[in-house]
Amino acid sequence: MEPLQKPFGTVLENFLNYLLIERNFSPNTRDSYRNDLQRYLQAMQEGCGSLEAINPDSINRFLDELHKTGLEASSIARNVSAIRSLHRFLINDRVLESNPAENLHQPKLPKYLPSVLTLDETMRILQAPAQKVPPEKLYLRDQAILELLYATGMRVSELVNLKQQNLYLQEQFIRVFGKGSKERLVPVGSSAINSLTLYRQKLRIQLAGAQSEDCLFLNARGKKMSRMAVFTIVKEYAMLAGIPKTVSPHTFRHTFATHLLEGGADLRAVQEMLGHSSIVATQIYTHIDRSFVKEVHRSFHPRG
């Protein structure tokens, strides 16, 4: 892909800086916007020649081309959202006087239910690190990661960015910084606390050595772990536990929410623990186990 020329390149960088500084978006979210908008602005640069020449037809032609590449509906929707946000920014920044993306509609997305682990599958994965033969040096760290993912439902990006000072283990809370640096306190149970304590006392000190790295979870070189490293760990122990389904850190997030709701937890409390800004995002977990919902209705409705 050829580099963007002025003013297209300038507009993109200004918008990305706006997302990072004024909207407080995470670097990962900003990079996602960069990838989508780089492709969009490249097409507009080649097809329109100027920002002022962009019109609804040129945007729709671009989206049609995305459809032809076989891009999933969710990815198309993400592109539409990015394009709309960019053009609103250009209006507010007085770069353009009219908004060609004003009437751009999001494509309808197929509803899906997230994959979750049964309680038995969850326990098998959580027990897998200690059952490795021979046991590996890093199993205490891996055990703590798995326990924490299930205990808190936090996102993988939140986990790798945890600092030592974010732990309040005596109070059984962890301070988590989510999307847009939104802060929340998440309860953590005794099993995860025990695993975290063992990791910090017996392994983390060795991994850190003389380095001053403050991130909670470190790799074998004493540096902050990457998101992909956590994905690899989760996948490895799921395979070791004989789980046939695809398991990722986000599977633990889905499982955390589902098991809480199946246990009778309040939907608003689960929303707060997950860090969802809208209750709608949390409600999907009420649809996962239809038999459970029916049982709740039978148990609590006066005429159930």
Put a short name on every predicted segment:
Residues 1-304:
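Conserved catalytic core of the tyrosine transesterase superfamily
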